[in-house]
Design a protein with these regions (language model features):
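The feature captures the beta-strand-to-loop junction immediately N-terminal to the Walker
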Residues: 30-35
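ABC transporter nucleotide-binding domain
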Residues: 164-180, 184-243
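Catalytic Walker B motif of ABC-type/P-loop ATPase nucleotide-binding domains
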Residues: 148-152
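Conserved ABC transporter NBD signature motif
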Residues: 56-67, 71-72
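Helix-to-loop junction immediately C-terminal to a conserved catalytic motif
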Residues: 48
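Conserved structural motif at the start of ABC-family nucleotide-binding domains
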Residues: 2, 17-19
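ABC-family P-loop ATPase nucleotide-binding domains
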Residues: 70-71, 78-135
Length: 275
């Protein structure tokens, strides 16, 4: 679906990616994690063709995204973090834009709008940021494109809406669709995203499935900190402790603890997951 090889990208003199290689497959919902400023949004824009690589290559569905060819654009939908809709009704927007996507399903859009409890007869400009966000997510999923990129989709959503978001994305995923979700609110999407990609300054620290992470790392609660642990952090009544998984059993992954473990123990993690 997406193949990135030896990618370099910089803004003027600010290097963002240095020799990055990465592949994304269909049938998965990727969680794209990283501290602010490491390039999560930049990566999504490169994949969607809004930014051109400095060197190296990025191939998406066998297209060069920077060329923005019609066949490419009809199979990709990108939702920016700060989406603001035009001064027309949501239904008008869907009718106008739906024709650009060969697999767009108007009935699916209507169902998703109902699930999100958003009235399509309202103008975007009359809705809250969260309601606008739900409307564009509903439209994106109804396009049935092969690749959907979401930048911080849970921002602006209240707690019930976040539950709705998890449900509709899970139901809309398929073997043919690749969904990439950039987020710093991992608890909102913890049971949805798999595999996990963690970016650091200039590159990719981790790109692994939840299954492989659970086979190699164990996340446990301990009343006291452990000096032998790879990582530990205070929690209510004790500590979350991360160790190598030396058993034959898979451990439930704590994505927030995983993120901190990877950032603070880069060489150890690199050694554990070396191919």
């Amino acid at each position: 679906m997406v193949t990135i090889e030896n990618l370099h990208f910089s803004y003027s003199r600010h290097l963002v990616f240095n020799d990055v290689s990465l592949s994304l497959e269909g049938g998965k919902i990727y969680g794209l994690l990283g501290q602010n400023g490491v390039g999560k949004t930049t990566l999504l824009k490169i994949i969607s063709g809004l930014l051109k690589v400095s060197s190296g290559s990025c191939s998406v569905m066998n297209y060069d995204p920077a060329k923005r060819e019609p066949g490419f654009l009809s199979e990709l939908f990108y939702i920016p973090e700060d989406f603001v809709g035009p001064d027309i009704t949501i239904n008008q927007f869907a009718k106008l834009r739906g024709d650009f996507y060969p697999s767009y399903d108007a009935n699916k859009f209507s169902r998703l709008m109902t699930d999100f409890e958003v009235n399509g007869n309202y103008k975007f400009t009359k809705l809250s940021f969260g309601q606008q966000k739900k409307a564009i997510i509903a439209f994106a999923l109804a396009t049935n494109t092969k690749l959907i990129l979401m930048d911080e989709p849970s921002n602006g959503l209240d707690i019930p809406s976040k539950a709705q978001l998890r449900r509709v994305i899970s139901q809309a995923s398929s073997d043919e669709t690749c969904i990439v979700i950039s987020t710093h609110q991992v608890r909102d999407l913890e049971n949805l995203i798999d595999p996990i990609i963690i970016l650091d300054k200039n590159g990719v620290l981790l790109n692994e499935s939840i299954e492989n992470i659970s086979r190699n790392l164990c996340f446990e609660f301990s009343p006291v900190p452990s000096e032998s642990a790879i990582y530990s952090e205070p929690a209510l009544g004790g500590y979350v402790v991360v160790n190598r998984n030396t058993s034959d059993q898979e451990c439930k992954v704590n994505i927030e603890a995983l993120f901190n473990t990877v950032l603070l123990n880069k060489e150890v993690i690199k050694d554990i997951f070396k191919k």
